[in-house]
Amino acid sequence: MKKILMLLLIAGFSRAQSLLTLDEALQLVRQNNLQLQKQQQKQKIAELETAIKRGQRLPALDFSATASYADEIAKLDIPIEKLGLSLPPNFTAPSIELGGHERTDFALGLRQPIFTGGKLRSQVELAQTAVEAEETRLTLLQQQAAYQTYWLFYQAQSLKKERKIQEASLMRLEVQLQQARSLFRAAQVMAYDTLQVFNQTLQVKMQLEQNQRDQRLIDLQMARLLNLATTRPIAEIDLVPPAGVRAVLDSLKQQALQHRPELSGIRLGQRSAQLSRKLAQATYWPDLGAEAKYHYGKPGLNQVTNEWMDYSTIGVNLQWNLWRANQDRRRVEAAEVELNRLTLEERELLRNIDYDVEKGWENAAFAVKQIQLAERLRAQQQERYRIVSTQQREGVATTNDVIIAEGDLTQAELQWQRALIQYYLAQSEILLAIGKIAE
């Protein structure tokens, strides 16, 4: 039993520590992200509201029960004198009691709207538009979450690559430190040279500590974004330099116009404004409804007998507001103003989309050029470091020359790696700008 428990614990630990790939992170963010889950609940609420609005167009069945007690009873006096009759002495005029003190009524009613001027239909369409707007909002949040996942993943790649470069730099410096100490013991260099190399080594170690801290923070941010119980180390991948082929800018802009969820949201807002105006105009018309009821009560229609009886009623109800201080007209005007505002917002959004696509495209082009230049610089710095190291062994170059060459080589390698990361981030920006990053 203990062995089984140990195996389960080891298996759970290995799963928790398994490397997180980009594809898995994108899948987890769609499944687990709390913002997306909250938006899904909002979408369900909108769907339920649509079902409620549709139900208002159907017949409604109501049941009611009433029981009351009256301390007075209506009486109907019989006019004896008018009938030509006379009452004996000491007799009061006869009367008929209508009903009794206790009144009870059970009713089952059916109500059906007949004409509302299009109010109910507009309300259903407005609710359905709200559902589509929530779906569009969910798509937008999915794209934003996917972009955050891309950004964190590539930031993690940058830190991992930088750490390797810093570790290689540290190894070179440690070799130089050993050589400097050997030369110092042989009285060929001063203590200053050894101290200079040692200080540079400490600088790189501090950078490695900061890199480790930054990687831990990236893991924490990724776990929060993916709603994971524990952090998982992000897998390291090989970043391939870009090829020479680039996407056509006009094609990217056309894709953005087709797929950006913000545009769909604006157009759904315009449709909602049109429906709101239509709904406000519908209040100019009367509401007509039919109603039928089945009653069982005491007293019934025959108040004189005061007995239990059943009966039915059927009728129509007309309600027409004739004056409301221009409230309906102002609602129509408000809907028209909202429609005009959304039209302007659409124009602004189109400009912003155009800018987003061009910005991502320019950033990608700039990153490609930076990669090419950084690659040449890295090769030159590698050759320079090799030459200076050889010259130092021959006694031509100083320790300071080697440290400067090593630092320049490290910076060139970091520049090349950062340019490569910037290219991949620019590609993510393009995917976000054209609305296809979550696909």
Where are each of the predicted segments found?
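Short segments within alpha-helical structural elements
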Residues: 41, 174, 203-228, 378-436
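Bacterial Sec-pathway N-terminal export signals of envelope proteins
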Residues: 16-66, 72, 114, 188, ...
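Small/polar, glycine/serine/threonine/aspartate-rich low-complexity segments that form flexible
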Residues: 64-109, 237-246, 278, 291-324
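Sec-dependent N-terminal signal peptides
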Residues: 3-12
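Sec/SRP-type N-terminal targeting helices
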Residues: 37-41, 54-55, 98-100, 114-142, ...
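Periplasmic alpha-helical coiled-coil/stalk elements that build and connect Gram-negative outer-membrane
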Residues: 48, 138-255, 360-363, 367, ...
